[in-house]
């Protein structure tokens, strides 16, 4: 099998590793090289900046039989693996011409976790030592990676992640019974956390959940997410909507709506950037977030006693609770308040954000320019779930 054939197999398979967003541009290219576009995604470097990365599997061979995974050993699919030299031949020219600024590398369990992780680290070590590559590397560790390989990864990578896939041991047992929650997932993450506290792994730790594969609720996911941020010092948790794959035990399960993935991302932002506590989130009786409203707006509609807030007097925490205002627009408000008062809606034009939404929850110098509570509730009750939102508040 030549290198292009391998890449045509391994690059599309890596799309299941979630990143910040997709950066590839669609081009009218021959079908044989379409993998090149799908290989470019985004990740976050040590300084928190988004950068384009080359996303690739070193091998799609796997000894495990996870119920949701297209790479499971029971699937009859083309298999391929790259050598360290082949990885260098593919990756480094793209760095040199500016197409990418980093590497996101993962692998299937090709042999066993220790052997497969070792091969991946050998490839990165070759990039670092033989070829002098000093740029960004995000390594996806395998469950059950041994302590020595975690230490080695901490010395080689800017970011390390290990996918939990499910929020609890009970949920994991439904979709991946070969993995032990504590031994194979939490213990390696704890070791990686300890290394990150020494100053290694500058871009931090991350993980990913497959949303909807194990029958978990949004509350299940976000309770665990909160714990991961607090106790294991994760920098980021990603959510990927479950998609059924032919030939797997879950092939007949309905796909998870992408809007659910979006709502979880929005709730994650509330936890990380807006000062919300997990228990404040607007769950329904089944522990799920509403699909037709983003969680910040749903929370605000459920708490009319908190609104409207006076834009000229509210502190930062109060302003961050206002639908339509985010950290950037709130910082502008606080800065502009030192120069004068907000009196009319057109004074908000310089702020950015979803100002039409914010009007329903603020007063300007004591005057309210939004809809009354009944009209506001009626307006939002008519909304239908959307597949994607272009902006976060």
Predicted regions and their residues:
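Conserved C-terminal portion of the radical SAM core fold
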Residues: 159, 164, 168, 183-249, ...
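Conserved, mostly hydrophobic/aromatic
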Residues: 53, 66, 105, 162, ...
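Residue-level signature of tetratricopeptide-repeat
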Residues: 336-337
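Flexible, acidic/Gly-rich N-terminal and inter-domain linker regions that tether
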Residues: 1-64, 354-355, 362-363, 367-384, ...
